[in-house]
A protein has these predicted regions:
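N-terminal capping/lid subdomain adjacent to the active-site entrance of alpha/beta enzymes
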Residues: 1-161, 166-175, 179-183, 207, ...
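Shared catalytic-loop signature of beta/alpha-barrel
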Residues: 58-59, 64-65, 199, 203, ...
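Flexible, glycine/charged-enriched surface loops at secondary-structure junctions
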Residues: 94-95, 188-192, 264-265
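Catalytic beta/alpha-barrel core
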Residues: 113, 133-141, 160-167, 184-196, ...
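Residue-level recognition of alpha-helix initiation/capping sites
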Residues: 118, 143, 172, 195-196, ...
Length: 332
């Protein structure tokens, strides 16, 4: 038996995308009974990355098997609800069900938006003061990004700075950004070029700063990415069709010599918490991007994740910690 309930939350500040600011995230809470146990999942389509809201809703209402490559958000929600039910029945956290070692927390990054170099330095300093050891800097894909990188890396010696171009730079600009990043010791540059430019990624990888891909995972498999020198893959479970599919991709990446970073897609609390459990299972040398709850206003349930000294606690409670089928009341 499965129940589906729509929800809408606000993003503050709005998420800047290629098509303009995204001020709200709309999705569906999925309740699914497996045997005697009920689990809760979340399907929150991301425009431009997954199926549309209406397609997701139709997929959840249908009785056909869901394809994670066609309706990834819907598949994520249904699969997660089943995983939570299975974990609760076994009285273990989802992280344990996914193969995580006995960990209680995972390292996470803070995120700093596109702004002036002075504002970047201030924001990075605030993140460091809050205990973060890794900060992700959003870039504009412009020559001025070099100044932003210099400002960010100049704040503290013992903090990892990574940067994300969202595929916005042209090749000459990306070359200057990546060359500067190599000199400044940047952890990695994420999606410096559009996903289609494999030759450009190969050129950038030769400059000395590790290259990560996000959007590129939707167009190329990890073997192809490894062949052009990509070092890190960024995995959004909602976009890739669920936690188990990300685990398979991460295993393939590890075999090819690539590291994996798990990030949320500014989802609501159920999917964010699940992403943290997945990050605990994936592990790896890099901080994960699952500490995005401070951006969500009017969330659908209390957030069980707490960031302390740059880490989020996953916890040992069954399922997703304090999130159960009673965490979200559609009639409230």
């Amino acid at each position: 038996m499965m129940q589906v309930h729509p929800f809408s939350v606000t993003l503050a500040p709005p998420l800047q995308t290629a098509t303009g600011p995204m001020r709200r995230r709309q999705g569906f809470v999925v309740r699914r009974q497996v045997g005697e146990t009920t689990g809760v999942g979340e399907a929150t389509p991301l425009p431009g990355w997954t199926e549309s809201q209406s397609t997701c809703e139709a997929a959840l209402a249908g009785d056909r098997p869901l394809d994670p490559t066609v309706t990834p958000a819907a598949h994520h929600g249904v699969e997660l609800a089943a995983l939570v039910a299975e974990a609760r029945a076994a009285e273990v956290p989802v992280a344990t069900l996914l193969g995580a070692p006995e960990v209680t927390s995972v390292p996470v990054n803070a995120t700093v938006g596109v702004s002036t170099p002075a504002e970047v330095a201030t924001a990075v300093g605030a993140a460091v003061d809050a205990g973060y050891r890794t900060v992700k800097l959003k870039l504009a894909g412009e020559p001025t990004d070099v100044d932003r990188l210099a400002a960010a890396t100049g704040v503290a010696d013992d903090v990892h700075i990574r940067a994300d171009c969202n595929g916005a730079a042209d090749r000459p600009t990306a070359i200057s950004i990546c060359a500067a990043a190599a000199e400044l010791g940047v952890e990695f540059i994420e999606q410096p070029l559009p996903p289609s430019d494999r030759a450009g990624l190969e050129e950038l990888a030769s400059l000395g700063c590790p290259i990560a891909v996000d959007e590129g995972l939707l167009e190329h498999d990890v073997t192809a990415l490894a062949e052009v020198g990509v070092a890190v893959i960024i995995c959004k479970p909602m976009v890739l069709g669920g936690l188990r599919r990300v685990l398979r991709i991460a295993a393939a990446a590890d075999a090819a010599g690539l590291a994996t970073v798990v990030t949320s897609s500014y989802d609501a609390v159920i999917a964010r918490t699940a992403a943290a459990h997945l990050a605990a299972a994936v592990g790896g040398p890099h901080a994960h991007g699952v500490a995005t709850g401070d951006r969500v206003v009017g969330d659908i349930a209390p957030d069980p994740l707490r960031v302390t000294e740059g880490r989020v606690t996953v916890g040992a409670e069954a399922g997703l910690g304090g999130l159960t089928e009673r965490s979200y009341d559609p009639g409230a």
